[in-house]
Amino acid sequence: MNLKKTENALSLTLKNFIKSESFGGIFLFLNAVLAMVVANSFLKESYFALWHTPFGFQIGDFFIGFSLHNWIDDVLMALFFLMIGLEIKRELLFGELSSFKKASFPVIAALGGMIAPGLIYFFLNADTPSQHGFGIPMATDIAFALGVIMLLGKRVPTALKVFLITLAVADDLGAIIVIALFYTTNLKFAWLLGALGVVLLLALLNRLNMRSLVPYLLLGVLLWFCVHQSGIHATIAAVVLAFMIPVKIPKDSKNVELLELGKRYAETSSGALLTKEQQEILHSIEEKASALQSPLERLEHFLAPISGYFIMPLFAFANAGVSVDSSINLEVDKVLFGVILGLCLGKPLGIFLITFISEKLKITARPKGISWWHILGAGLLAGIGFTMSMFISNLAFTSEHKDAMEVAKIAILLGSLISGIIGALYLFALDKRAALKK
């Protein structure tokens, strides 16, 4: 009965999100595998040289642009973080994070799932040049995790899918805070003041309920530039922009014109092809329906396929390729063990222990329809760090620590793969056990 209520409570938006993210996870995996194959083939020199190719335009001796790798990591990933920011805002206002009662359990779970892996890594790498990589195993890749959980189908309770999504959103918010606090260097306050001025303009547009996305996006580009120049990673600008996008729907949302257009279409004669009148009516319905959506919904709807099917796969292909040969020093400090143990052990233990303790102390309440065994399974899948972990590894290790970065990437791939396989087998076995009891 509770399971049925949970199923009904799952909104259409959330269902669409699950479907798109699950396919995106599979597509991400294929691109990661392709990157590893190419990076260890006769094409490896071309593969690595490609990402250092400068792209931009030149005026005399002045060049405006970046290497292809920086375009992906700094510009395209800003669009990904913009979408993440929109998802977080939506969940904070209307979703599973909209009240303390709803949010407390997954938020505390996310907190435990970040602290435990970070501590494991830091403990193993304390007082070494690699200790700055503690943020790497703290992340969860929602696309991969949902890809695995959706492959299990009905063997996984819907309530667990909702919990994993909410946990991952809270985890993303935590990752953004970690990036802002610990992976920011050489702050330039003049540019920060410029960024603050742009944020105030965005807040004014939001206050005026400006529904056109164009001014927000134009100011967003300016904000990205100011933040990029300030020393803070530019993806933070995208998250700030997301929180400034209006979420209110227009007051005339119960638009009678839309109903009238529907009636007009129903009254037209049907044939093998649409008539000109029917095409015009459908076009008007499309325009009216779009106008009823909030700017946040429109932008999120636009970014979701671009992020899932282009940006993230491209990021995976550009960053997952590591040439595994004798030149790699797998004994760089304890990076390999720190990342793998953080993802495979720290994530599930952190999530399980902190939620178990918080419920016993009556701070939170476990969602109906899922057992503690399910929570442990979700913790295992949360150990799939992949793209977010890769992103943080690029921030944690500069070109001076190339060995550590390469080892971290291998560890992320291994740790994510182990977590995914163990998590899937565990939830499959859990379902079989429940079926036998029946």
UniProtKB/Swiss-Prot annotation:
Keyword Transmembrane helix listed: yes
Keyword Cell inner membrane: yes
Keywords: Antiport, Cell inner membrane, Cell membrane, Ion transport, Membrane, Sodium, Sodium transport, Transmembrane, Transmembrane helix, Transport
Alphabetical list of InterPro entries matching this protein: Na/H_antiporter_dom_sf (IPR023171), NhaA (IPR004670)
Subcellular location: Cell inner membrane
Topology class, membrane: Multi-pass membrane protein
Highest taxon of the lineage: Bacteria
Biological process (GO), any one: regulation of pH
Family under the similarity heading: Belongs to the NhaA Na(+)/H(+) (TC 2.A.33) antiporter family.
UniProt function note: Na(+)/H(+) antiporter that extrudes sodium in exchange for external protons.
Protein name: Na(+)/H(+) antiporter NhaA
Source species: Helicobacter pylori (strain P12)
